[in-house]
Amino acid sequence: MPSVKAIENNELKELLEQYKISFFSMEYFENDLIRNFDNNISLNDDNIDDIRKNVIGKNVILIAAGPSLENELVSLKAVLESNERQNICVICVGKISRKLLENKIKPDYIAVTDAKDSTRWQISGIEDCGIPLLYLSTAASNVVSSYTGKRYIAYQNGFEKAEKMAEIKKNTLFDTGGSVA
C-alpha cells in the first residue's frame, strides 16, 4: 500500500495498515479458519464469558513471548508467591506456557489464538497440566482438541461465523485486532 505511506496523519495511517493486515490474514487463512471453527464448535466447550467472575476485580497479567521474558521470570515468580496472588489473574500465551511451568510459574489460563496447525508444539507435553485453555473459535483445532484440560471458547469480531454464533448464544464478541498479541 504505497499510498498509505504518503498519509501524514499517523493514527489514520496505522488504522489503515492494521486493516490491511487483518484483511489479508483473514483472506489467506479463510479455509483454515472455517475448518478450525467448525471443528472447535463441535467440541461444545464452555464460553469464555463463564470465567468473568474469576477475573473481574483482579489485576490481570498477560504474559507473552519476547526478549524481556527471561529477565522477568524471577520478578514474576516473586509476585505470584506473594500475599497478593489472590488478587492476580495470570494469562499466558501458548508459546511460553511450558517455559513458565518449567520455572514453577503456574498461570491461571493458557491462551491460544493462532489458526495454523503447526502451532501444536506450543502445548505439546502439557496437554493435561490442569490449567484451563482459552482459545479463539478459529484457533488451530488440532491444538484445541488435543488439550485434555478444561477449555473455554471465545468468539471474535471480523469472522462472520463467530459473530453469528455469539449472537445465537448471547456471548461476548472480542476484538482481536488482527494480531496474535
What function would you assign to each model-found segment?
Residues 94-97, 112-119, 136-140, 156-160:
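Short, acidic/turn-prone active-site loops that include or flank metal/cofactor-
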Residues 91, 109-111, 134, 152:
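Hydrophobic/aromatic beta-strand patches that form the interior of the parallel beta-sheet core
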Residues 91-92, 114-118, 125, 172-180:
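Short, glycine/acidic-rich beta->alpha junctions
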Residues 1-87, 98-103, 107, 118-131, ...:
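N-terminal donor/sugar-recognition subdomains of glycan-related enzymes
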Residues 141-181:
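Active-site/ligand-binding-proximal alpha/beta "capping" segment
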Residues 62-64, 134-136, 154:
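Short beta-strand segments
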